[in-house]
Amino acid sequence: MQVILLERVAKLGQMGEVVDVKPGYARNYLLPQGKALNASEANIAQFEAQKAQLEARNLETRKEAEAMAEKLDGQQFIVIRSASDAGALYGSVTTRDAAEAATADGFSLDRKQVSLSRPIKELGLHTVHVTLHPEVTADIVLNVARSAEEAELQASGKSIQELAAEAEAEAEFEIAELFDDIGSAASEDSDLVETPEDRATEEAEDEQP
């Protein structure tokens, strides 16, 4: 099926090009999204008549996207999720979650603008690709953590493995301190108990003139 592109489409072509695509791709994506028209003679003539207007609109939207990309690129957004001690999520983080996290921080993103090779299923920092315009992209970072405190530590560069090791070491230290306290208390108690040797010493001292 032939269509005429109304904007640049990655791996397909530039605005104004007539390209061959699969009918399903055209009907389910290109046509309803307003990215292309059926390449009939009437539509091609209509495009040529409106080409200058379409190019001006594309230039305007690209400038807006570039301005947003400057602010958005490299930004980090926190996503709180439940996870196991090993860092595996109970569920996953999707394109919708990424868009909602960015939007909550003041950036208007749609899930269709977010690209994930696969759903995120573990804690940590994850770089996510965002398409703001056919010619403008940005990368954001999702900080997936179990709490705001954990997210802050991850942002400082600590991995979930390092955080788990620190928590384990702290727990072992607290247990060791507890046993030390118990040992000290037991030693103090033993000093208060009178032994046969203590009584014999006291009796010998009493018998002395």
Swiss-Prot record:
GO terms for molecular function: rRNA binding; structural constituent of ribosome. One of its GO terms (cellular component) is ribosome. Disulfide bonds: none annotated. Residues 184-209 are annotated as: Disordered. It comes from the Bacteria. One of its GO terms (biological process) is translation. InterPro entries: Ribosomal_bL9, Ribosomal_bL9/RNase_H1_N, Ribosomal_bL9_bac/chp, Ribosomal_bL9_C, Ribosomal_bL9_C_sf, Ribosomal_bL9_N, Ribosomal_bL9_N_sf. Keywords: Ribonucleoprotein, Ribosomal protein, RNA-binding, rRNA-binding. SUPFAM superfamilies: L9 N-domain-like, Ribosomal protein L9 C-domain. Belongs to the bacterial ribosomal protein bL9 family. Binds to the 23S rRNA. This is Large ribosomal subunit protein bL9.
